[in-house]
């Protein structure tokens, strides 16, 4: 979900009642996608990894970014890449990693459209991560993903209840926001606001929503869960099986 930011940034993450449990929900920004503003058209989206010390005082409450290298386990990058690949396999989106220039959060930058880093979000039991909707949404904040540095992160996706959260699953959820999807009330959907390891990656409703925004993938087939190297906005603590996502 979107963290509570400056008023110029669109907020995300709260379930809006009543929501029907039958369809994806597109985010509130306009045009609400990358590339052409026309729904159903593809896009190339860049992404970059923010360095420790990057200023994010423009976020509600203020913060300083910690690089993923400094709080995630070795091998995390593969899970980030797999999360991007899970979306490009089902929708007409191409992702390209670029260098991050170190500019402050929401400032003018030549970094990726989606910038990824972490900061303290209050510790275990609260928000796991948050992701910002696409343009127009503040300055360069649109699309950015931030993880909670105080939670435990895992390369595995084994449902062991060890208190750690799947980097792949949470990243895929947050990328969904960064590309234009809101939370959905549809059960067993990646964009449902509760963390679960009952399934892997985008599900039918998530895929339908992303294809509505960007069109179907030009090449390739839907990935099988076994083909993904298994390892948001926020998850609210209800145990490992159910925690609210942003």
Regions found by a protein language model. Give the residues of each.
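A short, hydrophobic C-terminal helix/tail in secreted or cell-surface proteins
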Residues: 223-241
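Short, charged juxtamembrane terminal tails flanking transmembrane helices
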Residues: 243-246
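Bacterial N-terminal signal peptides that target proteins for export
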Residues: 1-9
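A ubiquitous, low-specificity "background" feature that marks scattered single residues
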Residues: 8-9, 212, 230
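Zinc-dependent metalloendopeptidases
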Residues: 19-223
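Short alpha-helical segments used as structural interaction elements across diverse proteins
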Residues: 1, 173, 239-241
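Bacterial N-terminal signal peptides
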Residues: 9-18
């Amino acid at each position: 979900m979107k963290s509570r930011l400056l008023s110029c940034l669109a907020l995300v993450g709260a379930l809006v009642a009543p929501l029907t449990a039958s369809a994806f929900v597109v985010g509130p920004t306009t045009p609400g996608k990358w590339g052409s503003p026309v729904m159903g058209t593809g896009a190339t989206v860049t992404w970059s990894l923010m360095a420790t010390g990057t200023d994010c005082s423009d976020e509600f409450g203020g913060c300083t970014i910690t690089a993923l290298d400094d709080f995630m386990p070795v091998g995390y990058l593969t899970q980030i890449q797999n999360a991007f690949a899970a979306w490009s396999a089902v929708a007409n989106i191409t992702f390209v990693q670029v260098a991050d220039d170190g500019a402050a959060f929401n400032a003018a930058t030549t970094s990726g459209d989606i910038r990824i880093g972490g900061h303290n979000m209050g510790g275990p039991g609260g928000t796991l991560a948050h992701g910002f909707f696409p343009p127009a949404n503040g300055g360069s904040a649109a699309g950015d993903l931030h993880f909670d540095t105080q939670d435990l992160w895992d390369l595995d996706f084994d449902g062991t209840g060890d208190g750690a959260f799947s980097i792949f699953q949470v990243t895929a959820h947050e990328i969904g926001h960064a590309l234009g999807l809101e939370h959905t009330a549809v059960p067993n959907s990646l964009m449902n606001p509760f963390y679960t390891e009952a399934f892997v990656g985008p599900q039918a409703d998530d895929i339908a929503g992303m294809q509505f925004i960007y069109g179907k993938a030009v090449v390739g087939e839907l990935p099988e869960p076994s083909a993904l190297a298994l390892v948001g906005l926020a998850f609210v603590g209800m145990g490992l099986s159910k925690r609210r996502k942003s």
